[in-house]
Amino acid sequence: MPPAEALEALRLMAWLSPGYPVGAYAYSHGLEWAVEAGDVRDEASLTAWLRDVCERGALRNDLILAAQAHAAARTSDGAALVAVNDLALALAPSRELHLETSQQGRSFLDATRGAWPCDALAALAEELPGPVAYPVAVGLAAGAHGMAPEPVLAAYGLAFLQNLVSAALRAAPVGQAAGTRVVAALAPRLAGLAEAAAASDLDALGAATFRLDLGSFRHETQYSRIFRS
């Protein structure tokens, strides 16, 4: 692998690693309520729940939004970037899920501007002084740095999935070996979702995870909880 490609791969792994300072560990995307309600109770139900999130819920939309933010960054189109971000924030169905994406997005953008600065990123980030959706921040940074979209989208999907599996290990009766099997089972689907998102436009956005959305409302008043969403 040429040094430039190796450096790009290392940058991507750093950005989407659990150690990047975005606070992903604090969010379960409604999984904590799904455990409380009995929807997620073992490896099979966790796999089914996560498959729906990936294919019919937020992850599919996130990948499309990240791809559109990446395209806007590659063409230095600040107006398009702002429009994508506004739409991404509006798509969050509850207060907690809005916090989940906006807090991580702002943290990611600030950390990346500080550690991996570049002129294009600095200029485009000025277009987003307020809340920033997480997929938009990732797409913006990758596009500003000239990174290819498909690997970024696939890596984002894997990071999203692994974070929710990590949440399941803390909230549900699912062990580490089972969690690893869940990731392995769903990883091939992530590659397909990333490829499709790279070729999609905003008209392809849509979700059908109503029980998860309603659960995120109920999580706001859940008596005992360890996650912010």
Curated annotation (Swiss-Prot):
GO MF: nickel cation binding
Signal peptide positions on this chain: none
Cited InterPro entries: UreF, UreF_sf
Main localisation: cytoplasm
GO CC term, one of those recorded: cytoplasm
Compartments in which it is found: Cytoplasm
Domain of life according to the entry: Bacteria
Gene3D superfamilies the record matches: Urease accessory protein UreF
Keywords linked to the UniProt accession: Chaperone, Cytoplasm, Nickel insertion
Family: Belongs to the UreF family.
Complex and partners: UreD, UreF and UreG form a complex that acts as a GTP-hydrolysis-dependent molecular chaperone, activating the urease apoprotein by helping to assemble the nickel containing metallocenter of UreC. The UreE protein probably delivers the nickel.
Physiological role: Required for maturation of urease via the functional incorporation of the urease nickel metallocenter.
UniProt name for this protein: Urease accessory protein UreF
Gene: ureF
